[in-house]
Every structure is written in structure tokens, then in C-alpha cells.
Amino acid sequence: RCEDPTYKPRVTETMPEIIDFIQALIDKGYAYEVDGDVYFRVTKVKEYGMLSGIKVEDLIAGASDRTLSVDEKKKESTTDFALWKKTDEGIQFDTPWSKGRPGWHTECVVMINKLFKDGKIDIHGGGQDLKFPHHENEIAQSMAYNGHPIANYWMHNQMINIDGEKMSKSLGNVLWAKDLIVEFGCNVFKWLMLSTHYRNPLNMTEKVIVGVRKEVSKVENATKNASLYLQVNHVPAHDYKK
């Protein structure tokens, strides 16, 4: 059973805090503005890579073998990431640097800073594919702004594959939880999700789903039979609920 969250922050409602946050990083020397864009100086955070194990020097070395884009040429280092991007398309916000939008790494950090004491949460979750660069960049900003990591513990779940292929819109093999629940029922869906460790990938195939349906059916039948036995033998509820 999932309860509704106490808070449902929106980026559009956090823009004043985002602008102040970015300006604070500029004032501290952790960020710089170039042609209306604002970038974070990754090399100033010695703890960078503490989550993913990635080394800054390896990132720099890797970038030396490829052609840099126009945006990358603006940066002091290829490892630096955008806190703010100037744009004349879509939703735009006014700032001291330009009309534009915040970088997605920054949005999350600022909303956490706004809602939680000292800008730190106990558990930060997300997909394994977000560990780097997204979560690593969140940590870097928190270290620069707060002087400590953004979370005490991290939980990264693996991906769901369909017949051995990554589930993605581009492949057209996306399965929605609501559709699986309608077709197979809540118990089958929950059993399927719990059939593997959250840090291991789940490969969904017709064979796997058939197997899960059989397992759930066995448990449901056993539960019904046990309940019927207790009722027939007049076992008081308070006795078998202990």
C-alpha cells in the first residue's frame, strides 16, 4: 500500500530558490557564467565520484579523444555540467544571467534543500542509470553548497527488460503497471516485482509471467483452504491471528 507523499514539489514553484542557489554557487567560486549559461566547476569538489567511483581525470582523458560540441567548448573543463541554460524555446524564466531553464541536476538538489533540514535526506532512490551523472552531480552541488552529501543512503534499482531487451519507448515495448494489474491482478503484479532483488534486472517474458501466476494461485488457494479449515473447526479469530 502506497500512501500519498506529504509534499509534491514542482520546479516551477521553486524558481526563486533555484536562482538563489545558483548565484550562491557562483559567489563561492563553484560555478561560472558563459554567454548566459551557468556551469558547475566539477574539479573544485575533491569528493566527486564518491558514489559512482568515477574519476575526474578519466572523464577528462576520455573527452580528449572526441570532437567537442559548441556547448562543451564554452566550459572551463569538459567535466563541468550546466546549472542554467539560456534558451528562447519552450518555458523560460528570467534570471540575472539569461532567460532560460535550470539544469535537471540542480532542480532536485534545490527542492531537497527547500523541504529538508540542512539539505539532507535519509534515503535517496532512483534507477541504476541515474547513479552517474545525475546523482553524482547532485552530491557535488550539495558538497559545494551545504558542505555535506545530499543523502545518507542510496538505493539504486535495476532495469526491467522485456524478452531480454531494455524497456523503452523507442523500441515500442513499454508495459505500464496499470495495464499489467488489469490483465493479471494486483497480486501477480506485486509477486512479479518482488521476484528478484531490486538491484538485479527483471527480465519479463511470457514464461516468467505464467510461472508467477501459478505461484500466486498456489498461495491464494492455500490461504483459502486454511481459512476454510479454521472456520469449519470453529477456531476463534483471536487464536489464529496471534
Question: Where does each model-flagged region fall?
Answer:
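Short, intrinsically disordered, charge-balanced linker/junction segments flanking boundaries
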Residues: 238-241
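Alpha-helical recognition segments enriched in aromatics with Gly/Pro capping
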Residues: 16-229
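N-terminal, positively charged nucleic-acid-binding surface of large information/translation enzymes
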Residues: 1-2
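Acidic carboxylate-rich catalytic motifs and surrounding loops in phosphoryl-/glycosyl-chemistry enzymes
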Residues: 7-13, 157
